[in-house]
Amino acid sequence: SEKTGCTILGKAEFLNPGGSVKDRTALGIIRAAQASGELQPGGRIVEGTAGNTGIGLTLLANAMGYTSTVVMPLTQSKEKIDTLELLGADLRLVGATSYSDPNHYTHTAEKLAKKFAQREEHGAIWARQFDNLANMDIHCRTTGEEIWAQTEGKVDGFICAAGTGGTIAGVSVALKEHNPGIAIGLADPAGAALYEYVRSGELTPSEGSSIMEGIGINHITDNFAHAQVDVAFRISDEEALPYIFDLLKHEGLCLG
């Protein structure tokens, strides 16, 4: 990096079949539910998602003999809605509300999963990606270990944003087991509360808002509770977007 003088490495999770890091989360959740017996052959997987986890779950459901129901805010991008419809998900679009609202997409998914479990022959599960520790576990066992191996242990820091907190929790645990001195950084968008939580322990949303979808939360998920974060950065859209387009124009990388 000419700007920083550092070597900056990116992990190309967009090369996963569903196009994002959430394919790992989806696989981890399904495998854990299979192992526990909660997910029966031919069963239904229900999840509330901003899109990417729903895409991963639907692809895996198709390949593994399950069906998927995806609950998503209708404010999410048309591209994600179109993709889920193309993949054959049972897509339920709901209004965008705060997490405290009983009609929030996550709570709607939970209620739907209970209904399906009662009436469908092969049952149903709620994936509950925010608080299901199978999320962070697969990132600890795969994503974090891959970063350590692929850098040959020559990594000083890792930084990512948090939606469910599964990636940053799992990767931070894995890397710090190898080297406790590795710095873990959180990039938090405007309007989210984790930046202030890391700095002061207060769960206070920052000023402003962001166009980023599925990133930035105002409560501590069970996954994020395990994240070993050393430093947090508040990133505005005005700061992030020029870098996104610079990477596209000069590096040939479309990152969002």
Model regions: which residues?
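PLP-dependent amino-acid enzyme catalytic core
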Residues: 1-256
